[in-house]
Amino acid sequence: MKIFSISKDDWSNGLAQLEKSYRLFGPVKEEEFHNFKELAKGKSPDLGYLNSRLSPKAIIYPQSEAMFEYSLDESEEDHHIMKEVDKDYSARAVIGIRPCDAKAFVLVNHNFDTPEYKDPYWIRACEATTLVGLACDAPCSSCFCTTAGCGPYHEEGLDVLLVDAADHYLAKILTEKGQKLVNAAGWDTAVDAAAAARQIETGRQEAEAKITAF
């Protein structure tokens, strides 16, 4: 397990490096609410949000998408032949996803990536996506993640877990994809793993203690 410290002063510089090799998505405020959108060049995700109005699911599994196309123009050689639509499966990173939303992807995966059935659209999108989670230190009053096999610091489904630590983030690397992203961003300030793990565990316990709705 590796844990890095990311100074908030260096945060935007790292995102600028990531823009060179990833499409970046994150929470963006729209009027009164936040939703996950592809970030404009040079724009940082708003990590001060509580929860997004809609799930970030559409980044991997859009509500509707074109899968095939064909032409009825008989002057074209391949008219009336159905063809798969070209899709952009270039590397993308979702910055600031909540652990509960990442866990939801794990649950959906049970339907779309099984020995009996493998959905090619889902699998390609998942393979292209790196999920950088943001630990939830101030759960909403309606949150019930701890009763659903999840939690505000849950790691399953994530590639990196970010923990807000005042003037910096602690970035816990969970997968090879997560390590690749951190390397690409140039975030290379390692910390004492044992001490950082204790700090993260304390934050987890304090956050879970705030979930009292259920």
Task: Please place each PLM-identified region on the residue numbering.
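Iron-sulfur-associated redox domains of electron-transfer enzymes in respiratory
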Residues: M1-F214
